[in-house]
């Protein structure tokens, strides 16, 4: 049974049909005749049908029609049979290019087209069994290997054969395109492949480390001679060769041995990195020889038997330079660790123990302006100074550690700002100390010159002495020891304090150098370092005694002030007695002096006045003793005085018209009022 299928350019994709179709043309349309077989499913592809029809019909079907607007003169010159020959000669040329294109497509896309319509050449699970252990998968694995090495030539190219690469192949048996296998079980060869994969990975990791290490190694060991470089680089190269041999032998072993070689390669890598780090630190720790040359030059400076200023200050600067260069026996790291531990101790002591975690969270959330305690600030400045001297800058690790210590007191940006300020202040302080040190040293030199000249003048031959006595007197200054006064000892003590203030560690050897340098300021070896040491100790003892006396005097003045403040409170009960005396003096301002010629009535009135005043005194005493407040006492006294004066005025007004001969004379305030009653037995 056969049918004619009419199609206008559409396509139905599917399996290829073996029978060649017949092409029938009708105007612009093409008719293809396809044979249909009963019992089979027929898949028709338009492209495949057109290709097969072109092959069957031959070259005549592909002959192009002449263009409608061709040149008539050109057609007139060409014979009528010639165009067919030319066209037939040109057709194989076009077919040749088509064949090349199809070949390239088959090479890169497979044997068939990549439109997904034809699947004749696609492998199926039924055709290739990946589980079969008898089939050798070496070629398949090689095809799916991924090579990560760099190619020697760049650009677009078509190469036949194996590509040239910069490094030996470090491929790993990765198979991204291969289909997954149904079962996870693998034969013995797969285990060997996995071991090879581990070894290759370890080799690539080690080669990467080696590729990065030589650059840094060259930069670090540039100041060393070539012999030292060869000696140092021979160790890691031997390690690399040894690890390569071990990895090469492990390819023929089991997976367990391959794991052991991988661990050994990791150990070799750690060892090589450690050796590089140690050699770099040893190179950084070396100091240039210029420092020692400066020290020797400074010690040789003399002027007329007396060392100048550079002798003392040079030793101090050389010691600081040696510390900066790392030539100390103790490293700066240990000093820095010690300073950080001291800071932790001070922070723990200054931190109040009653603060809980919740309270800390509340205070940290609030924008409270916090200030560092003075002790914490001093220790932090010491840490900043040591870190600047040893590292040259403050590393992130150091700042994080300081924040873990003082983070509850200060923020991160404030800590960085304070560290910078402390370093700047430390530099300015060191400059000020150096200038002050030089100034005091010059003063000491002047004092020594004056003292030595005085000693020489005293040692000169006195009047009337012989020549032998003169020779003895000349030799006396060399035998006589120099005696210091208190002012010179104080100056030396000031030099000692300034010198010690800048030292962090190893004060013993440095102070001894200071003693020796100061002793060399005296001519003819009149002073040794022990004398300098004893003089400084004597000055310190005097200062301690002076400070102790001042402290005692200040304590005594404080005690006196406190006693004066406590006197009004303690003498509150005794105050009424003094007030009582004053009251008595005021009450007795006016004393009645009785005339012997007066009558008895005036005497009686004066007696009554005295009795009334005597009765008022206990009342005043009761009022004063009841209240210790001075303001209340003055108010009560004023009121009672006013009442007494009013009574006196009334009595005097009554007595004036009756007895004009009596006189009232005011008594002075200093006189005491007699407590005894007057004698009433007057003469008749």
Curated annotation (Swiss-Prot):
Alphabetized InterPro entries for the sequence:
HRD
Recorded superkingdom: Eukaryota
Q: Which residues form the signal peptide?
A: none
Loss of this gene results in the following: No visible phenotype.
Composition bias type Polar residues, residue spans: 211-235, 261-284, 311-321, 611-631, 669-684
Q: Which GO terms describe its cellular component?
A: nucleolus; nucleus; rDNA protrusion
Spell out the coiled coil positions from the record. none
Decide whether keyword Nucleus is in the record: yes
Span list, region Disordered: 108-137, 157-287, 311-332, 609-631, 660-684
Q: Which residue stretches does the UniProt record annotate as biased composition, category Acidic residues?
A: 114-137
Q: Which subcellular locations apply to this protein?
A: Nucleus; Nucleus, Nucleolus
Q: Where is the composition biased (Basic and acidic residues)?
A: 157-167, 184-199, 238-260
BP GO annotations: negative regulation of gene expression, epigenetic; nucleosome organization; response to salt stress
Q: Which Pfam families match?
A: HUN (PF08729)
> What keywords were assigned to this record?
Chromatin regulator, Nucleus
Q: Does the record bear Nucleus in its keywords?
A: yes
Tell me the protein family, please.
Belongs to the ubinuclein family.
Q: How does it assemble?
A: Component of the HIRA complex made of UBN1, UBN2, ASF1A, CABIN1 and HIRA. Interacts with HIRA.
Question: What job does the chain carry out?
Answer: May be required for replication-independent chromatin assembly.
* Name used for this protein in its record: Ubinuclein-1
Q: Which organism is it from?
A: Arabidopsis thaliana
Q: What is the lineage of its organism?
A: Eukaryota, Viridiplantae, Streptophyta, Embryophyta, Tracheophyta
């Amino acid at each position: 049974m056969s049918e004619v299928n009419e199609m206008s350019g559409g396509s139905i994709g599917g399996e290829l049909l073996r029978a060649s179709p017949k092409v029938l043309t009708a105007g612009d349309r093409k008719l293809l005749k396809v044979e249909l077989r009963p019992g089979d499913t027929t898949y028709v592809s338009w492209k495949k049908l057109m290709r097969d029809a072109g092959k069957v019909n031959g070259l005549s079907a592909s002959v192009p029609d002449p263009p409608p607007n061709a040149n008539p003169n050109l057609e007139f010159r060409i014979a009528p049979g010639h165009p067919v020959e030319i066209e037939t000669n040109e057709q194989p040329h076009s077919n040749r290019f088509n064949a090349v294109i199809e070949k390239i497509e088959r090479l890169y896309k497979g044997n068939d087209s990549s439109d997904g319509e034809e699947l004749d050449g696609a492998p199926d699970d039924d055709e290739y069994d990946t589980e079969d252990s008898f089939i050798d998968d070496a070629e398949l694995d090689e095809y799916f290997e991924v090579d990560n090495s760099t190619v020697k030539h760049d650009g677009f190219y078509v190469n036949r054969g194996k590509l040239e690469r910069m490094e030996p192949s470090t491929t790993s048996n990765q198979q991204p395109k291969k289909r997954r296998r149904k079962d996870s079980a693998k034969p013995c060869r797969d285990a060997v492949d996995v071991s090879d994969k581990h070894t290759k990975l370890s080799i690539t990791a080690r080669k990467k480390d080696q590729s990065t290490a030589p650059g840094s190694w060259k930069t670090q060991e540039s100041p060393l001679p070539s012999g030292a470089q060869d000696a140092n680089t021979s160790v890691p190269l031997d390690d690399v060769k040894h690890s390569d041999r071990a990895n090469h032998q492990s390819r023929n072993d089991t997976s367990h041995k391959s794991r052991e070689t991988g661990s050994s390669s990791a150990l070799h890598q750690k060892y090589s990195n450690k050796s590089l780090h140690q050699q770099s630190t040893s190179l950084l720790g070396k100091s240039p020889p210029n420092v020692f040359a400066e020290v020797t030059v400074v010690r040789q400076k003399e002027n007329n038997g007396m060392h100048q200023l550079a002798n003392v200050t040079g030793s101090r600067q050389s010691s600081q330079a040696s510390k900066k260069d790392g030539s100390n026996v103790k490293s700066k790291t240990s000093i820095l660790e010690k300073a950080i531990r001291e800071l932790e101790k001070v922070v723990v002591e200054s931190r109040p123990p009653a603060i809980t975690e919740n309270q800390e969270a509340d205070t940290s959330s609030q924008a409270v302006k916090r200030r560092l305690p003075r002790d914490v600030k001093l220790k932090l400045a010491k840490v900043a100074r040591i870190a600047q001297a040893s590292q040259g800058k403050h590393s992130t690790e150091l700042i994080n550690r300081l924040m873990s210590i003082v983070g509850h007191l200060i923020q991160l940006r404030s800590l960085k700002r304070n560290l910078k300020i402390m370093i700047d202040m430390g530099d300015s302080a060191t400059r000020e100390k150096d200038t002050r040190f030089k100034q005091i040293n010059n003063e000491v030199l002047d004092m020594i010159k004056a003292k030595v000249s005085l000693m020489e003048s005293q040692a000169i031959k006195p009047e009337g002495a012989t020549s032998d006595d003169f020779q003895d007197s000349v030799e006396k200054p060399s035998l006589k020891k120099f005696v210091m006064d208190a002012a010179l000892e104080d100056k030396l003590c000031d030099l000692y304090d300034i010198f010690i203030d800048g030292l962090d560690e190893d004060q013993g050897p440095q102070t001894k150098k200071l003693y020796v340098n100061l002793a060399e300021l005296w001519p003819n070896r009149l002073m040794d370092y022990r004398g300098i040491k004893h003089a400084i100790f004597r000055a310190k003892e005097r200062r301690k005694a002076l400070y102790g006396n001042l402290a005692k005097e200040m304590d005594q003045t404080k005690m006196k002030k406190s006693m004066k403040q406590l006197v009004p409170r303690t003498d509150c009960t005794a105050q009424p007695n003094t007030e009582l005396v004053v009251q008595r003096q005021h009450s007795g301002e006016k004393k009645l002096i009785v005339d012997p010629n007066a009558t008895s009535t005036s005497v009686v009135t004066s007696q009554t006045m005295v009795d009334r005043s005597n009765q008022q005194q206990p009342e005043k005493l009761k009022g004063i003793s009841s209240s210790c407040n001075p303001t209340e006492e003055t108010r009560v006294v004023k009121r009672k005085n006013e009442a007494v004066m009013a009574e006196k005025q009334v009595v005097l007004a009554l007595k004036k018209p009756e007895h004009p001969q009596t006189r009232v004379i005011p008594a002075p305030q200093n006189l005491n009022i007699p407590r005894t009653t007057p004698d009433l037995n007057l003469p008749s």
